[in-house]
């Protein structure tokens, strides 16, 4: 079957068996359908922008979160109806959903996105006091309020255990990028049919890249291996890399990762020494690093903290932060090697001399 005719519903039902050999369980399909419905509502709210009764971006972001909360209640009610008496209080899956990542971009009509992660609930992981309480805890966004141990337990395990992950990017077109462990696939929202259509099957990230996304304003707080890597990229053809790189920063996590999935690149949000909390990293392990790392790896890329594979890290708390470096495999491998060399004390000390050796013949001007 040609992928141009495949909707998200048909994809999850197994109609694209050339892309996914295993049909996802019915309960997981239900979660992903509700995620799709939620992001459609969020996309509609964002498209109105400031045409409502407020001229502030905060109201747009608040409306998007409220739209998700409405879907969340419906999803919990559906889970309760489908749950037998013996299974009461035992949801099969739990969803971590960041409904509006980087909401400040709405103020400038910039790109925003949603990120989600789905974990299977272990049989021994649910011991809630009652079915009603558990039903309310079955699904929810971890960034809005604290959750108790019965809810969060499924997320306190390595990211490689995710059942599904994805993000939505709200741009000129609304796209849903999703993985269920068999490749990373992109769906575009058709404005006429209101259906997500499979437009980017089996996304692959090029192994080599010349584009780096990093906030260079934090350079003075970086660890030496990160500074070493970025400076080598800046030196371009005149340096040891012997080729030019393009550095950029948009302060939009989903947009940066989407660009990498579409055309390759490297994203760096390393730990730094600006604050005590930043030394542990700046991105959420549960609903930023883990789902995005899953998507990138399934597309042939790599994701690391600098010292550890992201999907091997098990967060200890719901709100744990971690550094994130992801993208084209060759560059992630290189920066991982720089971290190992630094930790072993075998890397060349990083220097930034005031005066460099110069020549009348510069490599970057040669033909």
Swiss-Prot record:
Is the keyword Hydrolase assigned to this protein? Answer: yes
Q: What keywords sit in the KW lines?
A: Carbohydrate metabolism, Cytoplasm, Hydrolase, Plasmid
Which BP terms in the Gene Ontology apply to this protein?
Answer: fructose 1,6-bisphosphate metabolic process; fructose 6-phosphate metabolic process; fructose metabolic process; gluconeogenesis; sucrose biosynthetic process
Say which species the protein is native to: Paraburkholderia phymatum (strain DSM 17167 / CIP 108236 / LMG 21445 / STM815)
Q: What is the lineage of its organism?
A: Bacteria, Pseudomonadati, Pseudomonadota, Betaproteobacteria, Burkholderiales
GO cellular-component term (any)? cytosol
One Pfam family per UniProt: FBPase
The protein here is known as Fructose-1,6-bisphosphatase class 1 3
Quaternary structure, from the entry: Homotetramer.
Query: Cross-referenced HAMAP family, in alphabetical order?
Result: FBPase_class1
């Amino acid at each position: 079957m040609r992928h141009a005719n495949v909707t998200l519903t048909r994809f999850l039902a197994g109609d694209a068996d050339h892309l996914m050999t295993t049909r996802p369980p019915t309960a997981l399909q239900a979660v992903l359908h509700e995620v799709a419905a939620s992001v459609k509502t969020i996309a509609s709210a964002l498209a109105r922008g400031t045409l409502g009764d407020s001229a502030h971006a905060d109201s747009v972001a608040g409306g998007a979160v409220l739209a998700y909360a409405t879907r969340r209640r419906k999803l919990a009610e559906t889970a309760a109806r489908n749950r037998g008496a013996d299974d009461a209080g035992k949801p099969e899956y739990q969803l971590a959903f960041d409904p509006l990542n980087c909401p400040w971009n709405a103020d400038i009509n910039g790109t925003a996105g949603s990120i989600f992660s789905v974990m299977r609930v272990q049989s021994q992981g649910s011991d809630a006091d009652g079915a009603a309480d558990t039903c309310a805890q079955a699904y929810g966004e971890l960034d809005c309020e604290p959750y108790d141990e019965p809810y969060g337990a499924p997320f306190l395990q390595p990211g490689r255990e995710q059942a599904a992950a994805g993000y939505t990017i709200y741009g000129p077109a609304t796209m849903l990028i999703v993985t269920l462990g068999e490749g990373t696939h992109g769906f575009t929202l058709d404005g006429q049919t209101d259906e997500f259509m499979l437009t980017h099957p089996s996304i692959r990230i090029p192994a080599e890249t010349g584009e780096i996304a990093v906030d260079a304003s934090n350079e003075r707080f970086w660890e030496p291996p990160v500074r070493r890597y970025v400076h080598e990229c800046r030196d371009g053809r005149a340096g040891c890399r012997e080729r030019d790189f393009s550095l950029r920063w948009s302060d939009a996590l989903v947009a940066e990762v989407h660009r990498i999935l579409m055309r390759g690149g490297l994203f760096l949000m390393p730990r730094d020494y600006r604050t005590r909390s930043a030394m542990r990293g700046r991105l959420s392990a549960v609903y930023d690093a883990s789902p995005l790392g899953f998507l990138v790896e399934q597309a042939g890329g790599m994701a690391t903290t600098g010292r550890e594979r992201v999907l091997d890290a098990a967060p200890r708390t719901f709100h744990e932060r971690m550094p994130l470096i992801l993208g084209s495999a060759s560059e992630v491998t290189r920066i991982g090697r720089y971290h190992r060399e630094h930790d072993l004390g075998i890397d060349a000390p990083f220097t930034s001399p005031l005066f460099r050796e110069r020549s009348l013949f510069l490599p970057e001007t040669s033909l």
